[in-house]
UniProtKB/Swiss-Prot annotation:
Protein's name according to its UniProt entry: S-adenosylmethionine:tRNA ribosyltransferase-isomerase
Name of the gene encoding the protein in the UniProt record: queA
One cellular-component annotation, GO: cytoplasm
Group of enzyme by EC: transferase
Subunit structure: Monomer.
Pathway(s) per entry: tRNA modification; tRNA-queuosine biosynthesis
Superkingdom of origin: Bacteria
Organism: Staphylococcus epidermidis (strain ATCC 35984 / DSM 28319 / BCRC 17069 / CCUG 31568 / BM 3577 / RP62A)
Subcellular location: Cytoplasm
UniProt-listed Enzyme Commission number(s): 2.4.99.17
Family matches, as NCBIfam families: PRK00147.1, queA
Function: Transfers and isomerizes the ribose moiety from AdoMet to the 7-aminomethyl group of 7-deazaguanine (preQ1-tRNA) to give epoxyqueuosine (oQ-tRNA).
Length: 341
């Protein structure tokens, strides 16, 4: 399959730059994955598509305020560091700007020494492995010194950083939000529970690879980035019970989907586990875990458009996207949502 097969025209004016005042007031485009039928609603109406006994799976990762601005100790030159992934202990994979002059052994100073980062390995494309030195708890230092790392297509400043977190965000570790979950409010989740729908949590820490464009023409040649995930025994038991009773597993977001499908690819049923996944889901993939998917609208020619095309089909997805453009839906992280079921 060619990357051009997953392209569509998106006017820049439809890229949402700020979140709506109320999370669940965003629009919802419901797509029947088997027939292609489209229904236009608001997100709060999603509850009408859930049935008692279904399980809704949410990613409880929390975005770190992981963009730091500091100085190179040796020269005082300004430097920006974006923390991506914890490797081990206090060692982190990061992106640096500018990166060229940061070599092994060089040290960076943030917040008058509240965080000091020492380069221990040089990677490609501005990447480095940095060893962090700080007193106390890293999350507290980041809350004090760091900025929220918004996606590259969002140009406006975010007044309230909590709007780039889900209301159930818990496990700190992401460089980007699992944006399908941004539409849920505590009130909506409570109403969903009252309907007899189960809520389950997984964790997948979203890396910046989610924004990296596909650089090959033949998508079979694309190499996916890896992301850390985990599932608890409680969640595994609930999902197995849901499947055994003939009810549906509805995934909130592509991150939850990648976690669930990774586990069911590797095991005959859901199990408590953790690890790294580089699963690449595109048309032809056999889904074993999910029966429904809530997701935002994704970038043209992205692996996420391929994922949703695999769950429904490419023709239905591109038709839905064209209709969403025509009706001026809001796109990407702060945009509107789809329910594919």
């Amino acid at each position: 399959m060619n990357i051009e097969d997953f392209d569509y025209h998106l006017p820049e004016s439809l890229i949402a730059q700020t979140p709506l005042k109320n999370r669940d007031q965003s629009r919802l485009l419901v797509l029947s994955k088997d027939t292609g039928e489209l229904t236009h609603l608001h997100f709060r109406d999603v509850i009408h598509y859930f049935e008692p006994g279904d399980t809704l799976v949410l990613n409880d990762t929390r975005v770190m305020p992981a963009r730091l601005f500091g100085l190179k100790e040796e020269t005082g030159a300004k430097v920006e560091m974006l923390m991506l992934t914890q490797i081990e202990g206090n060692d982190w994979e990061v992106l640096l700007k500018p990166a060229k002059r940061i070599k092994k052994g060089h040290r960076l100073n943030f917040g008058d020494g509240k965080i000091v980062a020492e380069c221990i390995e040089e990677l490609e494309q501005g990447g480095r492995i940095m060893r962090l030195h700080y007193e106390g708890i890293l999350q507290e230092r980041l809350d004090e010194l760091g900025d929220m790392p918004l996606p590259p297509y969002i140009k406006e400043r975010l007044d309230d950083p909590d709007r780039y977190q889900t209301v159930y965000a818990k496990e700190s570790g992401s460089a980007a939000a699992p944006t399908a979950g941004l539409h849920f409010t505590d009130d909506l989740l409570n109403k969903i529970k009252q309907k007899g729908v189960h809520i389950a949590f997984i964790t997948l820490h979203v890396g910046l690879g989610t924004f990296r464009p596909v650089s090959v023409e033949n998508i079979d040649d694309h190499e996916m980035h890896s992301e850390y995930y985990q599932m608890t025994q409680e969640t595994a038991d609930l999902l197995n019970k849901t499947k055994e009773s003939g009810k549906r597993v509805i995934s909130v977001g592509t991150t939850s989907t990648r976690t669930l499908e990774t586990i069911r690819r590797d095991h005959p049923q859901f199990v408590a586990t953790s690890g790294w996944t580089d699963i690449f889901i595109y048309p032809g993939f056999e889904f074993k875990a999910i029966d429904g998917l809530i997701t935002n609208f994704h970038l043209p020619k992205s692996t996420l458009v391929m994922l949703v095309s695999a769950f429904s089909n490419k023709k239905y997805i591109l038709n839905a996207y064209h209709k969403a453009v025509e009706m001026e839906y809001r796109f990407f992280s702060f945009g509107d949502a789809m329910l594919i079921i």
